[in-house]
Amino acid sequence: FERPFSEWLTQLTAYHTVDGVLYENGKAIDQDPFEYLDQVTVKGIKSDLPFAGGAIGFAGYDMIGLYENIGEIPEDTIGTPDMHFFIYESYLIFDHKKEKVYVVEDNIYSGRDNDAVRQALGQVVTNLQTQAPNEFTPQALQALQFSNHIEKEVFMDMVAKAKKLIREGDMFQCVLSQRFSADFSGKPLDYYRNLRVTNPSNYLYFYDIIKNTKLIFY
């Protein structure tokens, strides 16, 4: 994808379950994050393209704290946004099956005139056709040594409590999770490429959001 027209992200305040803060390009917005995102995205675009512009991003599990009382939310120790979206009108579509690249320039958000759109489109095509040095030669990846932030006994106790609540009818669905961490000095894109080759999946995305934060959804 090319440059985003604007950026939306929200992060829950530590230890609060209902107080959410939404930022639009660094400016705080006092409104429900999902309602605001729905308002600012253009609807009803007729296009033959598989993606006609709009919002791309993610909303994490902790967003439920804005709408349901789930008790105390654990302290955020890594600083990753609970919700993050980019709004696009200029982007590239990679068709891996047909081995084609589609260049898309639109004005649905910026309101640029047609001459500006055509000029931007031509510049992107020129950049793509310009021979560039190979800066993305994958490096050999070393095995990672992971550590978990929850001890096994603690996690198994969480499982036992969840089963008990389900049997008693107080809960019908539960998602238990824990975070694994490892030191990694290589390029995140190389890790993603290696994962895509060694263990491909239809649900596999490399998401580059903010400085020093890269997400791989698998």
Question: Model regions: which residues?
Answer:
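Extended alpha-helical targeting/anchoring segments
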Residues: 1-218
